[in-house]
Amino acid sequence: MGASEMDARADVAVIGGGLSGVTAALRAASQGRDVVLVRRGYGATATGCGALDVLGASPCESLGLMTCAHHDPVHALGSLLKRLPAHPYAMLAEGPAEAWPAFRARFDAASDFLLDHLAKAGLAVSGRLDALTAHATTHGTLRLTNLAPLAVHRGDVAGLREARVALLGVEGVSVFDPAFVGRSLEAILARERPEALSAAAHRAVRIPWARAAGGILPVEIARDLDDAERREVFAEEVARSLDGGSFTHAILAPVLGLERHAEVLELLSRRLGIPVSEPLVPPPHAIHGLRMQKALDRAIAGSRVRLVSARVTGAEIAGRRIVALEGEGDGGAVKIRADRFVLATGRFAGGGLTGRGTVRESIFGLPVFHRAKPLGDRAVFNLLRPGYFARQPLFDAGIRADSELRPLDADGRAAYENLLAAGTILGGYDLALDGTGPGVDLLTGFTAGEHAAAT
């Protein structure tokens, strides 16, 4: 190959650098395998809200706080698999009778593994499979989930009792309006848990170095707070804004650092002496997702996994085995040879599926399914239904896999002997409606990494 071309060799090659791909790569590497992870850039993980729904409530449903108190994960899993038999969880459940014990064991192993890596990379994540927590959002709503970054988890409103909450905005950062969110929170809790809140006050924090005009993005201030001197100034301003108040909790604008988020959170918690949290932020300003992606990057950098920045355009194939990936990087052509491959490219946001005219898997030409039936040449516009919140066939379409996570061909056989799939490239569920997207990433990524290391 030419001087500007790259030819790499590994035991396992993972395509995709989001939650599922990184989990698969880290797991395979932890089993002693030589792993290459190839990605072209950030995908859906970096733009997600940061909540890790496993058996959570749909973000599109209007569910009250009683949902948290009465969450039954065994029933939730059984109901999900009955309603969505092609859901990826069905591949991990080992049959109806063993569904919950097998799923619980798999979740415990996967979550312990990933959360340990994230914590070491500077992002603490908290929560449980058997509980839902409720968190304020910048839209003034509540978002229920299983796992969340510590900065969000500390603000679980389902656990408040006689709380005196200070909501602190930052001058110029219009994404978070503390007065609006505070009034909304008071109204919701007055209806559903009147004992939760005794007072809510809103304040504004002035940042001396920020421009006076509005339109400042949360990530701009977050990057500023990665600097130690500016962190100290910010902590002083926050403490000053709370003078004269007696508060038990503080919800701050979602600006508490990017690369040094843990240090910012620890400093403020220590300085204020009360739990400090942030609201969840939907896209496009979803800083929690960007922090998670940065933490995944640091986890990869601290592991034995080799990262290759390239766009995979195709593969060298011999019979029913993949020999190598072919792609384009900044320095020219890239070829990555491996014994086993993991496809974790996501759906439309990550580039795993393309949807111009018909829906296609973008690298291997794998068939795309809806409800266990291949879409073939079915036009995209025939996969859409009236109604904004209607279940859209297009949005739960994806590839299918067997119990070992090997993608299937149109006849239901493993398409390739040495290819596995993980994450949202797998169909059978709707990311917006079913409250399981990150759980699928975590569980299938972990499992695919184990299978890739073992075979």
Where do the PLM segments sit?
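Short hydrophobic core segments
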Residues: 13-15, 36-38, 312, 335-346
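Conserved N-terminal glycine-rich FAD pyrophosphate-binding loop of Rossmann-like flavoproteins
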Residues: 40-83, 209-221
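Conserved beta-strand-loop-beta-strand element in the redox core of flavoprotein oxidoreductases
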Residues: 314-335, 341
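A conserved FAD-binding loop/helix module that cradles the flavin
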Residues: 26, 49, 350-362, 416-417, ...
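Helical element adjacent to the flavin cofactor pocket in flavoenzyme catalytic cores
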Residues: 182-192, 228-250, 257-315
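Glycine-/small-residue-rich beta->alpha transition segments that form the dinucleotide
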Residues: 41, 331, 338-340, 344-351, ...
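FAD-binding beta-loop-beta segment adjacent to the flavin cofactor pocket
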Residues: 257, 332, 370-377, 383-437
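N-terminal Rossmann-like FAD-binding beta1-loop-alpha1 element of flavoenzymes
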Residues: 10-37
